[in-house]
Amino acid sequence: MKEINVNEIDKIKDPYIIDVREESELLETGTIKGAVHIPMMTVPNNLNKIPKYREVYILCRSGRRSYEVAAYLSELGYDVINLEGGILEYKGKLYK
């Protein structure tokens, strides 16, 4: 499984981002433009929403939950990249 700093995401053309935080966290802070919301605990039931044949970037508050989800998806054969630092470290614009 790969990791990059969350602020590198803005340099990537058309990234597929999954935000694994809870709904209340998204309402409080917003998320990166275009991110798909799939809460961490629901990921196993939503695998059909996650593309298998392209890079998928996983986002959370600080990078810990996203690391766990990325490791899980990596074991299932997904091409995943953890966004280190999460929303707390992200310096770009957030969308609600």
Briefly describe each language-model feature range.
Residues 59:
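Short, surface-exposed ligand- or partner-binding patches at beta-edge/loop junctions that are enriched
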